Regions:
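Class I SAM-dependent methyltransferase SAM/SAH-binding core
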Residues: 61-107
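N-terminal, positively charged/glycine-rich alpha-helical extensions of SAM-dependent methyltransferases
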Residues: 1-21
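Conserved alpha-helix/loop element of class I SAM-dependent methyltransferases that forms part
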Residues: 31-50
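Conserved class I S-adenosyl-L-methionine
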Residues: 50-56, 149-171
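Acceptor-substrate binding/catalytic loop of class I
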Residues: 172-189
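A short glycine-rich, Lys/Arg-flanked "PGG" loop and its adjoining helix->strand segment in the class I
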Residues: 132-144
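A conserved beta-strand element that flanks and buttresses the S-adenosyl-L-methionine
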Residues: 120
Length: 233
């Protein structure tokens, strides 16, 4: 199987690694978004004392939130500098139930043969060459009845204007060049791939940003940012 890795994306996020835990830095939007996405996960899945895998964990923002409830969390990312930052912050916070891995998902699943109650794949699918391959591996890593949570960006004119022009160039919520329009994904594409891998769609919810209040909220509008919840058969 060909490595499902974009070296350009890895370099991009390695350059930003020291910014991960700066709430006013390049990942400020993720710090603002994190409580919303974490509560979404908690509302749909029981994570207390469960085993979780955070795919594309970066510096560990969501990983640490999951660790407050889960029995154990594995965090996975291809950006080695982001993993170093995540490990350092884990040590600083005295967290014992996280293990970070500098690996891609496919190799991790092949080597570890572990199965998880909850998988999170947030703001990650749009950064790999084959998102379908990621979803297939997610299914392999889940127990029967396990939960998969995905968040990404829709592909249409509105999402280009808002997620790239607006977020990166006008509001400067993200560094310029964070996203490529051609890598955005329609919910129907993700659902089709997931169904092929034995994952059933439970929920599809939009995420909207208010530039005046600088807050995120859930919405029925999935035209730009959205989250999906799947369960394995």
């Amino acid at each position: 199987m060909k490595d499902n890795i974009s070296e350009e994306e890895v370099r991009k996020f390695n350059k930003l690694a020291e910014e991960w835990w700066n709430p006013d830095g390049s990942f400020a939007a993720l710090h603002t978004l994190n409580p919303l996405r974490f509560n979404y996960i908690k509302n749909w899945a029981e994570i207390n004392k469960k085993k979780c895998l955070d795919i594309g964990c970066g510096g560990g923002i969501l990983t640490e939130s999951l660790s407050k409830y889960a029995d154990h969390v594995d965090g996975l990312d291809m950006a080695n500098k982001a993993i170093s930052v995540a490990k350092n912050h884990q040590e600083l916070m005295g967290i014992k139930n996280i293990t970070y891995h500098n690996s891609n998902l496919e190799k991790f699943v092949e080597i570890n043969h572990e199965q998880y109650d909850v998988l999170t794949c947030m703001e990650m699918l749009e950064h790999v060459p084959s998102p379908e391959q990621i979803i297939e591996s997610c299914s392999k890593a889940l127990i029967g009845g396990g939960h998969l949570f995905i968040s990404t960006i829709n592909r249409n004119i509105k999402s280009y204007l808002m997620a790239i022009i607006g977020a990166e160039y006008i509001l400067k919520l993200l560094p310029q060049g964070t996203h490529e329009f051609d890598s955005f994904l329609k919910p129907s594409e993700i659902e089709q791939w997931s169904r092929k891998s034995g994952l059933n769609l439970i929920d599809l919810t939009g995420v909207m940003y208010n530039p005046i209040t600088k807050t995120f909220k859930l919405t029925d509008n999935v035209s730009v940012n959205y989250m999906m919840h799947f369960r394995k058969e």
